[in-house]
Amino acid sequence: MKKLLLLTALASVISVSASAAEKLIVAATPIPHAEILELIKPTLAKEGVDLQIKVFTDYVQPNVQVAEKRLDANFFQHQPYLDEFNKAKGTDLVAVTGVHIEPLGAYSSKYKKLDELPSGATVVIPNDATNGGRALLLLDKAGVIKL
């Protein structure tokens, strides 16, 4: 299903980008976005598109580089993040299509469950407004914090 959705999304990008060149440079986060792109790379090659994947662990640079036309597209973000980025950076990037929303995970070498966290424990959340807000809502729903 993800492969079909991504092929559809990339078809739109390709119709704009590949008409000028057969090379399509797309930024992606390592997991799962770059992995998904790797899956469709052979299919795109059959269509004459040389998909080049640039992997980023930073959520800012993919948008900056698309805005500066150093990359053709990126694949990693949901619409609220893109909207916040455009507002903060004064860019006008647009989504070709929506993407799936990744689940948030909680990881600890000390605790196996959220209910094991002691009162006053330190919890790290994403540093961007959209994902940070999402993390706070999930922690509230799990009873870890009270909003």
Residue ranges and their predicted role:
Residues M1-A20:
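Gram-negative bacterial Sec-dependent N-terminal signal peptides
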Residues A18-I25, L44-A45, L114-G120:
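Immediate post-signal peptide segment of exported/extracytoplasmic ligand-binding proteins
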Residues A21-I31, L51-V55, T122-V123:
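Short, well-ordered beta-strand elements
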Residues T43-V55, S119-G120, V144-L147:
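A local structural motif
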Residues I53-V64:
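Short helix-initiation/N-cap motifs at beta->coil->alpha
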Residues A67-Q77, A121, V144:
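Alpha-to-beta junction loops
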Residues E84-V96, Y111:
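Ligand-binding "clamshell"
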Residues V96-K146:
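A conserved helix-loop-strand patch within extracytoplasmic ligand-binding domains
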